[in-house]
């Protein structure tokens, strides 16, 4: 949620910054005029309440002196009905203001590239492992034997999309045998790395209430993409960001504890409503997938430094796995609803000859904290909103996909990245294994 006081005081600047985020100026004009009417209604109610108190005193005086109070009583009733009508108007305006404000995205940080879509994103850096060239150089033409990750998985008998579709529908799968073990190895490795970086590991609920979805900014705008629990105001989480960030909703955090860092593995559920026809095969776009999430609560002056270190935490996983990637800064038109600044980390998929998003790391500044009422006491002793950050560390299925493509061999086997071997009992290769 944006700061309404900032919007009132900086109309021209706020209009321009919202336009950078694809919001027409009329929306802000409407919001501010409703906000003005709401504040006027509040003032009128206060003035009428003062009037009512005066009349009440007159009635009491008249009763004490046994004089006629009928005029005063009539005036009191009139004032009372005016207050009632204004209270109803104020409540209605409150709802309208809140609803309009709830649909406005966060404002972008000053260094975010301005543009309507991903074409305006700016590459920050590219990373390739030194040993990578011995396997398969990124950006060179893919050799004929190179298969897509889903073909590798199906040939090895470790990914079963057919039975996933039979049991659950499109965009679901079974991990089988070494596939299940590889997925488990990947997320355990990720959690261990983040724990060493000072993140507290959590296991969260995977069903949350509507207030939690509102708090992180998924609701009301993205309700159509959520898996709802029928008959209840609850949702299966689209990311562990929701339960992790809402952990402190409505609380005041001790300043000396900041920054606070959480990490969690969770299944994530997404309808992918706008993705018809995109990535219909494989692990890239599923309705249910595992993801390791990172969340931070920081003081405002620390948050951009913490954004850089959180991005480095995501990159660390890919570097240790030996997977080539690049980092891009998202433009104002490509950023998520709650973000003030976002880096996407994209892993190289050699068969497709394309980078695919594997992590998105965002600073939401105080946008989520305002919705969730998460505060701390600043140095002046005043209550202030914390800044919240979130990032994937990483999407587990997409990491498995990148390993299968980047580490496959001409004979169809897949070399296990060195850092994962201890998690697989020392196994260094995935080979085709028969299963029923």
From Swiss-Prot:
One of its GO terms (molecular function) is transferase activity. It comes from the Bacteria. It catalyses: tRNA(Ser) + L-serine + ATP = L-seryl-tRNA(Ser) + AMP + diphosphate + H(+); tRNA(Sec) + L-serine + ATP = L-seryl-tRNA(Sec) + AMP + diphosphate + H(+). It is an enzyme of class 6 (ligase). Its EC number is 6.1.1.11. GO terms for biological process: selenocysteine biosynthetic process; seryl-tRNA aminoacylation. InterPro entries: aa-tRNA-synt_IIb, aa-tRNA-synth_II, aa-tRNA-synth_II/BPL/LPL, Ser-tRNA-ligase_type_1, Ser-tRNA-synth_1_N, SerRS_1_N_sf, SerRS_core, tRNA-bd_arm. CDD domains: SerRS_core. ATP binds at residues 270-272, 357-360. Pathway: Aminoacyl-tRNA biosynthesis; selenocysteinyl-tRNA(Sec) biosynthesis; L-seryl-tRNA(Sec) from L-serine and tRNA(Sec): step 1/1. Consists of two distinct domains, a catalytic core and a N-terminal extension that is involved in tRNA binding. This is Serine--tRNA ligase. It comes from Leuconostoc citreum (strain KM20).
